[in-house]
Amino acid sequence: MSNVCIIAWVYGRVQGVGFRYTTQHEAQRLGLTGYAKNMDDGSVEVVACGDAAQVEKLIKWLKEGGPRSARVDKILTEPHSPRETLTGFSIRY
């Protein structure tokens, strides 16, 4: 079981549709730490850390569109090394 952290930027209709809240719920269900945050360009930034297989499941869920009310057009991911210790999965403003 290896731990990884990723940062993802999710583009499409992802703000104002409950995207951060459902991402938080899914990440908590998978046992991940991190956060979801609305960005000024209309995207959502997601940082997720935990077991590599569980992080992959979250990425797959994000690529599949997240909540039904959202529409994901594009997702970019890369490895990430947070400068802070992340506990739980939060929504940032």
Curated annotation (Swiss-Prot):
The active site is at R20, N38. Its EC number is 3.6.1.7. Gene3D superfamilies: 3.30.70.100. SUPFAM superfamilies: Acylphosphatase/BLUF domain-like. It catalyses: an acyl phosphate + H2O = a carboxylate + phosphate + H(+). The keyword Disulfide bond applies. InterPro entries: Acylphosphatase, Acylphosphatase-like_dom, Acylphosphatase-like_dom_sf, Acylphosphatase_bac, Acylphosphatase_CS. Belongs to the acylphosphatase family. Residues 5-93 form the Acylphosphatase-like domain. GO terms for molecular function: acylphosphatase activity. The gene is yccX. Disulfide bonds join C5-C49. Keywords: Disulfide bond, Hydrolase. It comes from Salmonella typhimurium (strain LT2 / SGSC1412 / ATCC 700720). This is Acylphosphatase.
